[in-house]
Amino acid sequence: LRGITPAMKAQAPREPPQTEAAPPQPGTDETAQIEAGGLQGDMGWGPGWSVLTQATFIEQFHYAFPSAYEGQNSFGSEAEAEHTFSFSLFLGRRLWEGGELFFDPEFFQGYGLSRTLGIAGFPNGEAVKAGFANLHYNTSRLFIREAFGFGGGKETLEADPRQFAGEEDVDRLVLSVGKFSANDFFDDNDYSHDPRTQFMNWALWESAAWDYPADIVGFSDGAVAEWNTRSSTWHYGIFMEPTESNGAREDYHLGKAHGQILQFDRRYIVGGRSGTTRWFAYWNQAHMGSYAVAAQQQDPEDIILTRSYRSKVGLGSSWNQELTESIGAFLRASWDDGRTESFTFTEVDRSVAGGLSIAGKSWRRPADTAGIAAVVNGLSANQRHYLEEGGTGLILGDGALSYSPEEILEAYYEFRPWHGLEFGPDFQYVRNPGYNSVRGPVSVYAVRAHVEF
C-alpha cells in the first residue's frame, strides 16, 4: 500500500440531500450504522456547533493490457499504480433559528491512474482531474442554509456535513447559498452516491451524462431551493460555470454562463420496504466547443478553436429500493444532447447503470457492506466522430477510435470493525476503455480505507 496515507478526491463526493435524513443501510441497526452519505455526530464544541471530519485513502493498480495504439489522453496500457488521499473538516454553526453556516476546508493529494484520463467511467471517484503531488488545500464548501417551516408535523434530522441534528417541519422550504458541490443536493441515491464508502466508479456514484457545473476539483458557487413534504421533494439549483473546460476560474458572464437543474423525488413504501424515485432535467450554458463545427474546420481535432457561448440539455433518473432486510437495489439512467463538448464532469452522453448493496447480516457482520454493479456508457454521433478523427476531449483521446460502448463491472467489500472505520477491496473490469474496441479489457484493483468521526 506504499504505507497507508488515505485518498483524494474527484468531483466532489456526495452527501445525502440536506432536506431529508438518509434511510438506514439495509440490515444494519441504527446504532451500528455508518451513514453512507457522510459523517454523523457532533464533536461537542458546545451548543450551536457541529464538528465532523473524514479521511479517505485509495490505492489502485492495474496490470498491462492489450492495446492496438495509444494517444494523448489514453488510459496507459502498461502496468501502473497510483493513490489518492483526502482529508475534510466539516464545521457548522447555528446562526439563528432555522439559519446555519457551514465551512468545509479540505486537503487532497495523489493522482488517478494515467493522470485521470482514458476511461469515461473512471474507476476512482476520489481522483481530481488535475492531481496533486503534495497536499493541496481547497475551501470546498462555504454556505448558509436557511429553513422555513410550514407545518405538516415534525421530522427528526440527523447531523451530517450539510445540516444540524434536530427537528424541523415536514413541510419546509430550505434555501442554501454559497459554495458547494451541485451533487451535494442533486442526483442522490441511497446505495451509490459516495465513492468514499460505496461504489467508486464515476458512472455509478453519479449520473454520468449530467455534466454538472464545477471547477477542477468539483465545486461551484450557487444557490439551491428545496421544497420538502412527507413523500416528495422538489429541488431547483443554479450554479456558476468555469471559464473553460475543466477550468479553475468561474465565468462571471452570468447571463450566458451558468447551469440550472430541476429535480423531483418521490418516496414510497411497498410491502413494508422503502424506495425512492428521482427525475431531473438540466440546462447548461457555457463557453463550449461544438463537435459539428469542429468537424467542418481545417483542424477537426481541436475543439477549443470552436468555443463560443452555447447550451447543453440533459435528462436523468434514478431509483433505489430496499428489497429485503439486507439487500437494496439501485438503477440510474441519464442522457444529454451530445452537441457540445463535455465540459466539467466526464465524456458520456448516454448511460445506464444498476446494482445491489448487500449488508453483512446474513454472514454475521451486520455493519459490513458488499456491492456489485454494472454500467454501460455511450457517446453521441457527433462526439464519436470527433474522437474518430483524432480529437481530444475532457479526458478522452486515443488518436483514433474503433467505437464500442464502454462496459464496466464493479464489486467492493467494506469491513466496518467499529463505528467510524471502514476498509476493504474493490475490483473493476472495464471493457472498451474510452469506447475503443481495440484497447483492453483492463482489470483495476483497489484497496480503500475510510475514517470518520
For the regions a protein language model found, what residue spans apply to each?
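Transmembrane beta-barrel strands of outer-membrane/channel proteins
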Residues: 55-61, 103-107, 175-179, 236-240, ...
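Outer membrane beta-barrel transmembrane domains
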Residues: 265, 280-309, 337, 341-430
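Residue-level signature of outer-membrane beta-barrel architecture
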Residues: 93-95, 105, 146-148, 179, ...
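Hydrophobic, lipid-facing positions within transmembrane beta-strands of outer-membrane proteins
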Residues: 49, 83-89, 138-144, 173, ...
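Surface-exposed coil loops of outer-membrane beta-barrel proteins
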Residues: 117-140, 151-263, 301, 390-401
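Short loop/turn motifs that connect adjacent beta-strands in outer-membrane beta-barrel proteins
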Residues: 39-51, 63-64, 92-101, 149-172, ...
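Outer-membrane beta-barrel "beta-signal"
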Residues: 140-153, 372, 441-453
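N-terminal periplasmic/intermembrane-space "pro-region" immediately following the signal or transit peptide
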Residues: 1-80, 90, 94-96, 100, ...
